[in-house]
Amino acid sequence: MKIKFLIFPFIFFLLIILVLFYLLIIDRNPSKLPSNLLNKNFPKIEAVSLLKEEKFLSSKEFGNEIILVNFFATWCKPCIDEHVFIKKFSNEKKIKVIGINYKDNPKKTVKWLKKLGNPYSNIAIDKNGRIAIDWGVYGIPETFLINSKGIIKYRHAGPITDEVYNKINKIIN
């Protein structure tokens, strides 16, 4: 009977150690989370446009060109950090940059863009997060690169850094 009382705590302790060890060894980098959309057509978008009077339709916005789709919000600190790179992509004119404003206040977004500069050719408002769900977004910022045939070729979860910027440029060229 005493042996049973000693074995159960030992097994419990061993399980806790195994769980902790597992949590330490798994890679927790969100940019390495898999996307089911890679090498597939982009999900269609119908939303209110932040910049234009007409409805945002991906069928109009996504033509026969390379497109960078960036999910962002004004309350997102990493979005502010990556904004420099988004502007760089826009200024280079190699690709069209589309923004998806995720669960944000449109008036704040307009002010934010006036202050930091607007790199987006158009911005869809994702008020309730439905577009992000359709795209499999884990969190923001998150960026997708779509080729001229409408196929998602690259996805990055997290802010764009020098390394990611260079990686996207290699794919484009």
Regions found by a protein language model. Name each.
Residues 1-7, 28-31, 91-92, 96, ...:
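Short, Lys/Arg-enriched, disordered terminal segments
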Residues 1-48:
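N-terminal targeting signals for export/organelle localization
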Residues 41, 65-67, 71-75, 139:
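Short pre-active-site segment immediately N-terminal to redox-active cysteine/selenocysteine motifs
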Residues 45-67:
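A short beta-strand-turn-helix
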Residues 69, 98-100, 144:
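Conserved hydrophobic packing residues within short motifs/helices of P-loop NTPase cores
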Residues 71-88:
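Conserved redox-active cysteine motifs that mediate thiol-disulfide chemistry
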Residues 91-92, 96-128, 140:
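Conserved segment of the thioredoxin-like fold in thiol-based oxidoreductases
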Residues 114-119, 126-172:
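Thiol/disulfide oxidoreductase modules built on the thioredoxin-like
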